[in-house]
Design a protein with these regions (language model features):
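Short acidic, low-complexity segments enriched in Ser/Thr/Gly/Pro
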Residues: 132, 136-137, 171
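Juxtamembrane/interfacial segments around transmembrane helices
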Residues: 143-145, 244-252
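Conserved helix-loop functional segments at active or binding sites
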Residues: 169, 205-209, 251
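Generic structural signal for alpha-helix termini and adjacent loop/cap motifs
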Residues: 21-25, 78-82, 139, 163-166, ...
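Flexible coil segments in periplasmic/lumen-exposed cytochrome c-class electron-transfer proteins
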Residues: 2-66, 70, 90-91, 116-123, ...
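Gly/Gly-Pro-rich "capping" loops immediately C-terminal to redox-active cysteine motifs
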Residues: 1-9, 84-132, 210-246
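Active-site rim elements
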Residues: 253-263
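Sequence/structural segment immediately N-terminal to covalent heme-attachment motifs in c-type
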Residues: 64-100, 183-220, 238
Length: 302
């Protein structure tokens, strides 16, 4: 989903007209002239200033390998459905990489492939993008790795490469990762339990089980239990999870593009991350191989 400022007046008018005439709505159509006048009166992005640019996903259709890139995007959005033999829980890539990896501070894919191969402290060696993706399959999705040369792995890499655009290895990409949170804060899991009940349970369930629709399909992912990420996942670390929560959760309560995400204080984010990251979840047997050379982070679960 592109940033609001990237859309033409005509495109915004078409979107608004569609919404106003769909799902039982009976509003009149909006034309480009009306949008132009309104844009002159308001700042398109009057939230926090950022140089992060969300790619226009429709543009991938012009890529010479468009079919492969689209397959890669679908694999990130529908991972469990398309790769059931490799996903061992109820998560998809987009559970952590929001909006198919297009959200600033939501672990976006924008520019990422330019930085691989790179040294990974947890692995203690230089790894390629395929190995990094398989780390997510084994940890965040508690599943099995894809063969690096398989068509599906190469489709996922192709999607990353398309998202790279003109990024160079030496560049700094705004919005990369999950943002920052004050690392000096002391977690209070009891307050975290209260924050979870107040801000998170409505989507992720009172017992962290996630939320399904009437057809049994998972709408919001489970945060603990057998169907969630294992202890080897980055999201099982308090301060990694806290930074993600701080910048991306809850959704729908703010004006931040594109999901209305964020709003918790640093302390509440740290507390709720401490609470849910330490709930029961699957083990990761290969944890004994992690950080063979570098210092283990203090918030690691093992």
């Amino acid at each position: 989903m592109p940033g609001f400022a990237q859309l033409e007046d005509r495109e915004i008018a078409e979107i608004l007209s569609f919404v106003r005439s769909s799902w039982g709505n009976q509003g009149s159509s909006i034309d480009a002239g009306q949008v132009k006048k309104l844009r002159q009166r308001i700042e398109a992005g009057n939230g926090p200033a950022t140089t992060f640019v969300s790619p226009r996903l429709a543009d991938m259709l012009a890529a010479p390998n468009a079919e492969q890139v689209v397959r890669g995007m679908r694999l990130h959005l529908e991972t469990r459905e398309l790769l059931p033999a490799n996903v061992g829980n109820q998560l998809n890539c987009t559970s952590c990489h929001l909006n198919a990896g297009t959200v600033a501070d939501g672990s976006p894919f924008v520019g990422v492939s330019a930085f691989f191969p790179s040294y990974a402290p947890r692995a203690g060696k230089v790894i390629g993008l395929e190995e990094r993706i398989n780390g997510c399959f084994r940890r965040s999705m508690n599943g099995k790795p894809l063969p690096p040369d398989s068509a599906d792995m190469q489709a996922m890499v192709a999607y990353f490469d398309w998202m790279k655009n003109n990024t160079r290895p030496q560049d700094k990409v705004a919005g990369r990762g999950v943002g920052k949170v004050d690392p000096a804060l002391k977690p209070d899991p009891e307050n975290g339990r209260k924050v979870y009940a107040r801000q998170c349970a409505v989507c992720h369930g009172e017992n962290g089980e996630g939320l399904r629709n009437s057809a049994g399909e998972m709408l919001f992912p489970p945060l603990w239990g057998d169907e969630s990420f294992n202890i080897g996942a980055g999201m099982a670390r308090t301060f990694t999870a806290a930074a993600f929560v701080k910048h991306n959760m809850p959704i729908g309560f703010q004006e931040r593009f594109p999901l209305g995400q964020g709003g918790l204080s640093d302390q509440d984010a740290v507390d709720v991350a401490e609470y849910f990251s330490h709930q029961p979840r699957p083990d990761f047997p290969d944890k004994i191989k992690d950080w063979p050379k570098d210092k283990r982070p203090l918030d690691a679960r093992y």
